[in-house]
Amino acid sequence: MVTALQTRNLTKVYQGKEAVSDVNMTIKQGEIYGFLGPNGAGKTTVMRMITNLVKPTSGEIEFFGEKMTPGSYEMLKRMGCIIEYPVFYDKLSARENLMLHGEYMGYYDPQSATAALELVKLSDINNKPVKQFSLGMKQRLGIARAVMTKPELLILDEPINGLDPVGIKELRDVFRMLSREYGMTLLISSHLLGEIEQVADTIGVIREGRLMEEVSMESIRGRNSHYIELVTPDSTKAVYVLSHQLGLNNFKVMDPGLIRIYDDGITLSDLNKALVLGDVGVENLSRKHHSLEDYFMERIGGEGIA
């Protein structure tokens, strides 16, 4: 598969401190790459370097095999992006904002503005001044602006902020369509792990400026994908029952009071019976599916995401 974007030892130093350190990222053409990390981990800084908004301290960025430089303006025209909060001319309409953007990018196709507004469900209000738009509507317009020039790489930093559940699902479908039907490559950061899980092909996890791992969603789903979750005030007793009375060894104490059991050979009823007979308090016992959130929290150690 063709590599759309690759970074080599990408580093950014601010006031003597590394905000991003030796990031080696590989994104394949046509895939959706979910970029995850705690608040301040370096996600936005990486995106800003890729889009030439911030100059790297060291390292390289290649776009379809061609090295990017501060003067790579033609290369940047092949990208669309939303970095942080999208800004518009508030007194102009959605369509007028898109037409101005097209002119700035040297992309003169009025139909592309119409198509982009239809894509994000804004075609019925394209003449309303943007100052009357809600946060979610502005976010949709930002995505329309990013895709109207038909970029090869779409970079979206928290693209579903401010959207209601219906809007989130609609954009999720848009992202899939852009990737599957148009062959567009997407780099998306989001704090909504459940949404990334539903659309991403590959996940990159960054922490304290370092890319910890790149892994396919298929691989994540295949890692101990099913388990039993036990919530108990008696973890020590529970561990004794699991190991000594039931002979189980494939389990993990996640937190005080939370144990995950990865043994497929025991039923919930048998497990509950053994715990009760062992005088273990059981607050909850249920089967779970190993999710992207589980994977992420294991990697970043409970810092949370933003």
What feature does the model see in each segment?
Residues 1-5, 302-306:
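Short, Lys/Arg-enriched, disordered terminal segments
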Residues 2-7, 12-188, 193-207, 211-213:
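ABC transporter nucleotide-binding domains
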Residues 11, 95, 119, 193, ...:
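Alpha-helix N-cap/helix-start and coil->helix boundary motif
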Residues 32, 87, 152, 183, ...:
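Generic structural signal for secondary-structure transition and capping sites
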Residues 67, 108, 123, 248-249, ...:
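Short coil/loop linkers at secondary-structure junctions
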Residues 172-262:
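ABC transporter nucleotide-binding domain
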Residues 226-299, 306:
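Short, charged/small-residue-rich alpha-helical element at the C-terminal edge
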